[in-house]
Amino acid sequence: MASFTSFCVLFTFCLLLLAHQARSGERQYKTESRNGKCVGEDDQLHAPTEVWYNDNDCSEHTCVNDDTGYYEIIRRCTLIAYPDECHMINGTGPRYPQCCCKVTCELD
């Protein structure tokens, strides 16, 4: 019975972990604008609603604007806490979010 309970606890944890991995770390920063475009973190001009990527730090960027100004939304991989039975593996792709690390757990 104890091993079944342990399995259920670990299985539930893994489901919660997968749900957590689907969310990104998202931040919004007010940015400078020129000619109706955002000045991105990469010092390039980006039109509102334009999406671009920084493959060096596995992030996705979007330029948005409203009545208060221009903003750059940056999505990056989240930090993942995991139990000893699990380990982190590299992402499977070159671009966000596929480049984010994932956690895998061994079930006994």
Curated annotation (Swiss-Prot):
Expressed by the venom gland. One of its GO terms (cellular component) is extracellular region. Keywords: Disulfide bond, Secreted, Signal, Toxin. Contains 4 disulfide bonds. One of its GO terms (molecular function) is toxin activity. Residues 1-24 form the signal peptide. SMART domains: SVWC. It is found in: Secreted. Belongs to the scoloptoxin-16 family. This is U-scoloptoxin(16)-Er10a.
